Amino acid sequence: YAPTISTIQKRGYVEKPDNEGRERNYDQWKMKNGETFVQKFRLPSEAEWEFAARGGRDLAPYPWGGPYARNEQGCVLANFKPMRGDYVEDATAYTAPVESHSPNDYGLYNMSGNVAEWTNTAYDETVYDFSWDLAPDYVYHAKVDDPPALKRKVIRGGSWKDIGYYCQTGTRTFEYSDTAKAYIGFRSVMSYLGRGKS
């Protein structure tokens, strides 16, 4: 995982946060899933995203390890909506600069809050009933004429508009892959890191 969102500049996109240090949001899941990336980059699976979000803390509900969304002083630990209609308790109404909150133990920022993140995993309410028997990832690339239920993709991490529940590393929800939302972004992964053949 890259600590910030990474895309390919040659295609007219950027490979860094905007000039105010905020994460970028992009249109449509399809654009994020391969059409803008060189083959080495892709969206993470839901399992890969959760592994990275936990930062080595296997049973922790949040990337920072604790069971609460606030520290001992009462400060929020991510950019999310702590109470009904309360978007500015952390001093930002929408997306915050990337380094506004501490990274997890892998050095990854905003694995909870700020913007939710697309995964490559297709959303189905019953996926946990069969996915572990078959494979840890459930992928389906919807066709244009497929029904809306087949166009759902898992998003993880919660955003500035979500309550703390959606910021938990084990919480999943969905969005339709052909929609654009100001509160959903992505981070890319590389399929292989290491040396080539000698």
Residue ranges and their predicted role:
Residues 15-16:
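Short beta-strand "wing" residues that participate in macromolecule-binding interfaces
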Residues 182-197:
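Short, structured beta-strand segments at or near domain termini in extracellular proteins/domains
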Residues 10, 20-169, 195-198:
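Functional-site microenvironments in short loops/helix caps that host divalent-cation chemistry
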Residues 1-7:
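Short amphipathic alpha-helical interaction segments
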